[in-house]
Amino acid sequence: MDLWQLLLTLAVAGSSDAFSGSEATPAFLVRASQSLQILYPVLETNSSGNPKFTKCRSPELETFSCHWTDGANHSLQSPGSVQMFYIRRDIQEWKECPDYVSAGENSCYFNSSYTSVWTPYCIKLTSNGGIVDHKCFSVEDIVQPDPPVGLNWTLLNISLTEIHADILVKWEPPPNTDVKMGWIILEYELHYKELNETQWKMMDPLMVTSVPMYSLRLDKEYEVRVRTRQRNTEKYGKFSEVLLITFPQMNPSACEEDFQFPWFLIIMFGILGLAVTLFLLIFSKQQRIKMLILPPVPVPKIKGIDPDLLKEGKLEEVNTILAIHDNYKHEFYNDDSWVEFIELDIDDPDEKTEGSDTDRLLSNDHEKSLNIFGAKDDDSGRTSCYEPDILEADFHVSDMCDGTSEVAQPQRLKGEADISCLDQKNQNNSPSNDAAPANQQPSVIHVEENKPRPLLIGGTESTHQAVHHQLSNPSSLANIDFYAQVSDITPAGNVVLSPGQKNKTGNPQCDTHPEVVTSCQANFIVDNAYFCEVDAKKYIALAPHVEAESHVEPSFNQEDIYITTESLTTTAGRSGTAEHVPSSEIPVPDYTSIHIVQSPQGLVLNATALPLPDKEFLSSCGYVSTDQLNKIMP
C-alpha cells in the first residue's frame, strides 16, 4: 500500500506541467505541497505535540540544512525515534537525511552533493513509521547568508568646530559565499545607534562593502552592525558582530555644543500669531472689508432731488428743483440769445422797497422816470443779445473801429432818451426849436451796484423805429411792453409780481430847432444800443454851443461806462419835455410770463415779440468809454 502511494506521488510530481523546465517555480511547489497534503492527510495535523520543522536555510546557495523541534512526547526523544526523509525530481523515492550531525541536534545537513539549485524539494518527519510534519521548498528560496565579517571604521575628517566628524565603515562579505565569482549577489544593510540608545537607525540597502557616516558627534560613542541578503529576496541573514566606534578624546571646550538659535520655533510662532491676528481682523471688520472688496451698486439718483418725488410722480417739483440749480440747466438756455435774466436782492426785506423800481416807476420825478430804461450790460462790449442775426463780420469791423475802446469789463448804465419828444418834433417841424441845442447835452445816470437793475429793452435800429412809431401814435401806447416788476419770491420758488400802474404825463412838446433835431436824428446810427465814437463826433459837431449857466455840464467819472445813442438823443429833447406838461398817459409795461426760475436771485423771462421790419444789417463800430467821450466832447 505504501509503495502504491509513493508511485502515485511520483507520478503527480513528475508530470509534464510541473517539470517542463530546468527549474521549479513557486507555483509548482505550492501545487506539489497541495498534492502531498491530499495524498497524506495525516501531515496536516501536528497538534499533538509531535516534532515539526522550524526552518530550512542555505547560506551560500550551495548547501542547506533543515531544523525541527523536539516533540512533547518523551517516547519520541530517544535517538532514532524521529527520522527525516526527502524527495526531489531526479530521484524517484524517499530518502533519509544524509547527515544528522553536521548541522547540529535535530537537524539535517545537505552538502553540495545533495543540493540541487532550482530543484524543488519535499521533506517529511516520521515517528515510529508515521508522518508528523512535512515541507516543500526550493533551495534559492531559503537562502539566508552568513553575517559579514571584518567590520572596521576609518576617520575621514573633523569639522572646524571640532564637534562633528565623518567616518567610513568597512566589512567583508561572508567567507563561505562565492561573491567574487558571481554565484550569489548580496545586499547589505547597516544599522547604527548611540551607545546608550535602544532604537537602531537603519540605512538604505546597498551592494558595496563600505558606507560613509557623516556628522557623528565626537563626544558620543556609536554601535554599528551589518546584515546581508540575497538580491531580490526579503529574508536577511544574521547580524554581524557589533562594532563600537569611539572617537579620541578632544578638548572639552571644543566638544561643547554650539548654541543654535531656535529659528524654526520663532518662525512657526510668528506665522501662527500672524494668522490669528489676520483672522481676528477679518472677523471684526468683515462688513467693511466686504464693502471694499465688493462695493454695493449705487442706487440711481439725482443729486439734490429726493427719490421719493420720482416714485410719487411729482414731476413738477422735480422740474422746479432742476430749474433752480445751474448744474441741471439745459444747454438751450445757455445758448438762447433771446433770454434775459433778472437779478433779485432778497437779503434784506427793508431794502426791497427802498429805492425800488416800483418807486421810480410810480414817481413823477424827472430823474426817476429816466431810470426805467437802465440796463445791465452782461455782454461786456460784445454785440447785443437782441441782435442774433448780425453777421460775424460785424464783430471784426467793431474791433477795428476803435482800438482804444475798453470792452473787457462788465458795465452798468442807466439812461433813456425821451423818444417821444424827438418823434413829435420831427412830425410837427416846429420853428420853436431854436432853443433846443442849448439843452442837448448827454446825460449819464449811475446805478448803485447793490440795487436791482431793470432789463434794458433795446436792440437793432428797426426795433427803435417801431418804438418811435408807437410813441407817435397815442392809441398804441398801451400795448408797449418793457419789463415785469417782481415784488417777492416765496420759499417754494413762486414769483410774486407787482400790479401794473400808469404815470400820467403830458404830451411832450419840445422847443428844439427842427433843423438840429432832424440832423441829429438822421445822423445817428443805432448799433447794439451803444454810442459809437464816430457818431459821438458827428453829434458833437452838429450840436450848437448854448450858453446856459443853469445847466450842469455832464461829467463821466465812473470808469467802464458806455454811452448809448438813446441817452444822447434824450438829452437833446429834455428841455422841451420840462417846459411842456404832457396830458397823455405813458403806460407801464404789461407783465411778461416767467419762463423758469434759474436761481434764488435770477429769473428767466419769455422774450417779448415786437413787430420787426425787414432786417437790415448795419456795420458795427467800436464802443466809446466815458473817458474817451469826455476827451472828444467840447
UniProtKB/Swiss-Prot annotation:
CDD domains per the UniProt record, alphabetical: FN3
GO MF term set: cytokine receptor activity
Residues modified to Phosphotyrosine: 483, 591
Cystine pairings recorded for this chain: 56-66, 97-108, 122-136
Gene3D superfamilies xrefs: Immunoglobulins
One family name in Pfam for this protein: GHBP
GO cellular component entries: external side of plasma membrane; extracellular region
Protein name: Growth hormone receptor
Provenance organism: Bos indicus (Zebu)
Gene that encodes it: GHR
